[in-house]
Design a protein with these regions (language model features):
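Helical element adjacent to the flavin cofactor pocket in flavoenzyme catalytic cores
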Residues: 138-192, 196, 201-203, 351
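Eukaryotic N-terminal targeting leaders
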Residues: 1-5, 23-28, 37, 355-365
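Active-site substrate-recognition segment that forms the wall
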Residues: 7, 14-25, 32, 48, ...
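Conserved N-terminal glycine-rich FAD pyrophosphate-binding loop of Rossmann-like flavoproteins
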Residues: 2-4, 36-66
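Flavin (FAD/FMN) cofactor-binding and adjacent substrate-gating region
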Residues: 73-166
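C-terminal catalytic lobe of FAD-dependent flavoproteins
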Residues: 130-132, 157, 291-365
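Short beta-strand to alpha-helix junction loop
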Residues: 60-74, 141-157, 268-273, 340-341
Length: 365
């Protein structure tokens, strides 16, 4: 049987999911190379800092929306049948303020906070809250059952699933994407390289995509558990500040955030932002602390900053050839990498298969 050597560059949620789907075909021999691996916490490595939850942002009818629709069944299946993945069901309440519609956070969440969103027919238990149940200043709100992902469990779980299928993991730092073709664990040149380097695609040789930019998110993880997830379209603290609360599975703590700061590379948690994040979280869901405690009642595990790998024209999922190396790109997913991970990986795998089929056909001539 013919075998095909594939190198996936990047070990965030996009790279790991792509490697997992590729490795399900026995003929594919997959090597994953990355500067950062699950267990690392680094400003360049966005996936560990994610909330992470399923909250669709894509505009109705867009590729983004279809990717989110197509990924939901996989996340739902993991929550139902493989709780060891660190994914569990959580109710979420989304609050919308019309005055946020022209802010960075309001535009980011416009579809999510719509009173009639496209995803209402397939997420679980969707309902619009009656107007008499809305908090002051809220124009509409919705509630549904989503999933929350404990990234500290899920990313290593993806690694373990890849390894069960024979994937080999190697740390490496590349200056040029074409170098990846020489890093396959077989010692032979790769048939295809899959570029899942996220924000690094901005500077990686042979890619150097100037459409890629960071969107800074500052969060904190606390031990407090309010019992369900909550989010809102914006805040009065600034157009790029927002509030969300995500209790993670398996003792992962509760993520509270956050910020949506485009082109901000600052890797250090800002104490002023941290204070505002805590104040907003308590206002959004007072159940976080006992009555009368205030922010002093928040038991902080850690502060963190992640740079969402956004791209001006949206994710790049396409075939390429760089210095004679066949490349498939899958990067630029911004703050929605988890909730499009499976569908975008499936598209990337389809492109890899096209390249392999072409190589196979030429070899027969």
């Amino acid at each position: 049987m013919s075998t095909y050597n594939i190198v996936v560059v990047g070990a965030g949620v996009t790279g790991l999911t792509t490697a997992l789907l590729l490795s399900k075909t026995p003929a594919n021999k997959v090597t994953v190379i990355a500067k950062h691996m699950p267990g690392d916490y680094d400003i360049e490595y966005a996936s560990p800092w994610a909330g992470a939850s399923y909250m669709p942002f894509g505009k109705k009818g867009s590729d983004h929306a279809e990717w989110e629709r197509a990924t939901w069944p996989a996340l739902r299946d993991l929550a139902e049948h493989q709780p060891e993945s660190g994914i569990h069901f959580q109710d979420i309440t989304i609050h919308n303020r019309l005055k946020d519609q022209n802010t960075a956070t309001g535009q980011w969440s416009a579809e999510l906070t719509s009173a009639n969103p496209w995803f209402k027919d397939f997420v679980l238990n969707f309902q619009n809250l009656p107007r008499d149940q809305l908090p002051p200043g809220i124009d509409n709100a919705q509630r549904f059952t989503s999933v929350c992902i404990n990234t500290a469990i899920y990313l290593p779980w993806l690694v373990s699933q890849c390894m069960k299928n024979g994937c080999v993991f190697k740390r490496a730092v590349l200056k040029h994407i074409s170098e990846a073709a020489e890093t396959h664990h077989s010692g032979k040149k790769a048939n295809v390289v899959v570029n899942c380097t996220g924000l690094a695609s901005r500077t990686l040789g042979g890619v150097a995509d100037d459409q890629v930019y960071p969107v800074r998110g500052q969060i904190m993880i606390v031990r407090n558990d309010p019992g369900s997830m909550t989010s809102i379209s914006g805040s009065d603290d600034g157009g790029d500040e927002v509030s969300y609360i995500f209790p993670r599975a398996a003792g992962g703590g509760t993520v509270i955030g956050g910020t949506y700061q485009k082109n901000n590379w600052d890797p250090l948690p800002d104490p002023n932002f941290a204070n505002r994040i805590m104040q907003r979280a308590l206002k959004l869901d007072p159940r976080l602390v006992k009555e009368g405690q205030g922010v002093e009642g928040l038991d902080i595990v850690r502060h963190g900053v992640g740079l969402r790998p956004a791209r001006t024209d949206g994710p790049r999922i396409e075939k390429d050839q760089v210095d004679g190396v066949k490349v498939v790109h899958n990067y630029g997913h911004g703050g929605f990498g988890y909730q499009v991970s499976f569908s975008c990986a499936e598209k990337a795998v389809g492109l890899v298969n096209e390249i392999i089929q072409q190589q196979h056909d030429r070899a027969k001539l």
